[in-house]
Amino acid sequence: YSPEDVSVATPAYRRTGWGFKVGYGTSRNHIDLYLLRAQDHQSSIDEYWWDRLTAQENIVVGLKGRWQISKPLALTANIATSIFSTDINAQKVESKETEKLDGVFDVRYSSLMRWAGDVNLTANFKPISMALTYKMVQPDYMSLGVSYMSNNYHSIGVSANTRIWK
């Protein structure tokens, strides 16, 4: 193997991560807190590639919940923030704001903090149900927890459905 051999495929970093989800409530009313921490290990590929393919790291924190407003109405929501560094070798940011994350995440000049979320209001009046949905993902929202995700959009949706046969 020669790192200069262009016929060799681009390598991939060994990526590790951990996370948890903890919640409280019932199936009708609940709230969950979740966290994901993932990072690439720079030493897992040949040094030749380090400035061509940067190692990344990410932390995601989110809240997800459901509230049964009344018998036919339910509200569900999911909101998450992602702090994503595209280069773990970039210089660390030294400021009062970033000190709050010391020991949790190294904020670098290659780091971005973005938000994503959705809210759904559903009404179930048998045999008809309806839903109003709003989704938002900020530009450049990224997470190492998903292989692909569209970003930079807002969407509003309305849907209705019914049963034809029992």
Give, region by region, the residue ranges found by the protein language model.
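Signature for the C-terminal beta-barrel architecture of outer-membrane proteins
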Residues: Y1-K166
